[in-house]
Amino acid sequence: MKIIKVTDLNLKDKKVLIRSDLNVPIKNGKIMCNMRIIKSLETINFVIKNEAKCVIVASHLGNPIEEKYDYNFSLTHIVNHMKKIIKYPIRLIQNYLNGFEAKEKEIIVLENVRFNPGERKNDKNLSKKYANLCDILVMDSFGSSHRSESSTTGIIKFAPISCIGLLFLKEIKYLKKALFNSKRPIVTIFGGSKISTKLGVIEKLSNISENVLVGGGIANTILFSKGHNIGKSLHDKNNISKIKKFLYKKNIIIPKDFIVTDNINKFSSYKEKSIKEIKNEDYIVDIGKKSCECFIKIIKKAKTIFWNGPLGLIEIKQFRNGTKEIANSVIHSSAKSIIGGGETVLAMRMFNFIDRFSYISTGGGAFLSFIEKQELPVLSELKKFKKYTNFKQN
């Protein structure tokens, strides 16, 4: 069934709630990467220019404990940043579930939806309260569309009209095109610390990619599954059986050497070792020189590159080199490059490479989930929405 787009609707004099993705990395109150905020503005501006009576923006930020306000997770930081880059008045509201008053042409930002009890559990009553705030719901948060929560899938069931936003639509259109109309060879790069969420998509992309290059916790888990000593390195013992499904695929390339340390901090000394040289007290924190050379050789031949997750511990400067070297080879290749995931985007911003990729997705888990299944819980709900399937502009 066709999904209603925000461009299909007459927004004039309507209360419009936009579920955006403003979940950005913040350190000591400072926004480290504002990409998601910037990309969300297209839909917000579209709604304002089409004369909505009230523009309401909702988002989550991080993983606070439900029912407990925590300033570190407050959207105060986001709103203060938005005030600098948008010309309309913006106001943050903390208590909004029972309604509120808004001035004309004012943007209302709702405080972190994850402060609300029941949000993560997709509570029906909470979903209804969100829906009661608007005439039209615009689902624009691609980054959280793989989650079934009250402000994602739940609200769609109860909003008078539910539609898809401009950013969300761009994401799925681009990723579909990249998946099904990509030039070959296709090379996929996987790293990062989140392992279990990537196993399905690794298997999927290993079937359509000429090569899959892995680092980080995923490489460690594969090495551990093969019986290698990885010392104290990050790995996922709970998913060994799933890893074994693609353990010996010839197109999955794991590092041959590593940067290791016996103490993880910014003053740590480190050594380069082969897998056979790793000791019980070692932590693998980056890929080594030989692995970089091997990966770069493969990347040079690629025509399409998918990338999710850094290859080393990028939080510490001396363990970023592997990720930086590989990123440098990607941006200087002739390949179309598609990256996704918060850590990946943050790393590229650190290296000042952020504008050098063909496409940067705002999704991490959603990016992976859509690549794996070409479907998302939020998309499924939007397809079910039948109340106004014949609703026309004006």
From Swiss-Prot:
EC number: 2.7.2.3
ATP-binding listed as a keyword: yes
Highest taxon in the source lineage: Bacteria
Gene3D superfamilies: Phosphoglycerate kinase, N-terminal domain (3.40.50.1260)
Pfam families with a match to the protein in the record: PGK (PF00162)
Keywords carried by this UniProt record: ATP-binding, Cytoplasm, Glycolysis, Kinase, Nucleotide-binding, Transferase
Localization per Swiss-Prot or TrEMBL: Cytoplasm
HAMAP family documented for this protein: Phosphoglyc_kinase
Name the record gives this protein: Phosphoglycerate kinase
Source organism phylogeny: Bacteria, Pseudomonadati, Pseudomonadota, Gammaproteobacteria, Enterobacterales
